[in-house]
Swiss-Prot record:
Together with NdufAF3 associates with mitochondrial complex I assembly intermediates during its biogenesis. One of its GO terms (cellular component) is mitochondrion. It comes from the Eukaryota. Belongs to the NDUFAF4 family. Involved in the assembly of mitochondrial NADH:ubiquinone oxidoreductase complex (complex I). Together with NdufAF3, involved in biogenesis of complex 1 modules N, Q and P-peripheral, but not the P-distal module. Required for recruitment of the complex I assembly factor Timmdc1 to complex 1 assembly intermediates. One of its GO terms (biological process) is mitochondrial respiratory chain complex I assembly. This is NADH dehydrogenase [ubiquinone] 1 alpha subcomplex assembly factor 4. The gene is NdufAF4. Pfam families: UPF0240.
Length: 203
């Protein structure tokens, strides 16, 4: 039922639509929208004060027109320039994104210490590689590599180097002697043999 009603209403709206459209277009002046009561009261008050107000609005004022011709607007705002620069940058970025992708798809190698080491080191700083080196040198030969020599070598402050050498150490791998290892295993198995023999003797 609803489809039938909508179909009838649609056909009624489209009936003679061209003639109705021509009649609307042939009107010299469109029908103005209704005004609010407050606007009508303001208009009445204005006409009471100046009855020729409507004529003045419709009449061209030559003095105002001449002043308007002498007005020139010059803008020094850089907003338009910034917008153009941003649009140019976005266009360049789009062109870069449209470049062909690299064909090499292998995973890059990891860095030795987990980060890219800088090529230039400012005075008062050292890399992790340098710190491990002078810590290891000091542990192996403290007399040849004291804190003062390390500070001069790596351009560091001596108290800082002393703190590093005091609180940080490198790992040392200890490999026991094979003879000592065999001795420990023999000593560990002897009590087990004694316990086993005593348990077998006692029913």
């Amino acid at each position: 039922m609803g489809q039938v009603v909508s179909m009838v209403a649609r056909r009624a709206n489209r009936f003679n639509v061209e003639n109705r459209a021509h009649r609307v277009l042939e009107r010299e002046k469109p029908t103005p929208a209704p005004k609010f009561d407050s606007n009508l009261r303001d208009m009445e008050r204005t006409l009471e004060l100046d009855p020729k107000f409507v004529d003045k609005l419709n009449m061209k004022d030559s003095s105002l027109d001449g002043r308007l011709k002498d007005v020139y607007v010059t803008s020094q705002d850089r907003f338009i320039k910034r917008v153009q620069e941003r649009q140019a940058a976005e266009a360049a970025a789009d062109n870069v994104e449209q470049r062909p992708l690299p064909l090499e798809r292998k995973t890059p190698d990891d860095f030795e210490y987990g980060y890219l080491e800088p090529n230039r080191i400012s005075p008062g700083h050292c890399t992790l590689r340098q710190a491990l080196k002078f810590i290891n040198d000091h542990q192996l030969d403290p007399e040849s590599w004291p804190a003062k020599k390390i500070a001069n070598e790596y351009k560091l402050k001596e108290p800082l180097v002393e703190n590093i050498l005091h609180y940080f150490k490198t790992f040392n791998m200890y490999i026991p002697d094979q003879k000592y290892k065999d001795t420990m295993l023999t000593q560990a198995t002897q009590p087990l043999l004694r316990v086993k023999s005593s348990s077998e003797g006692n029913p």
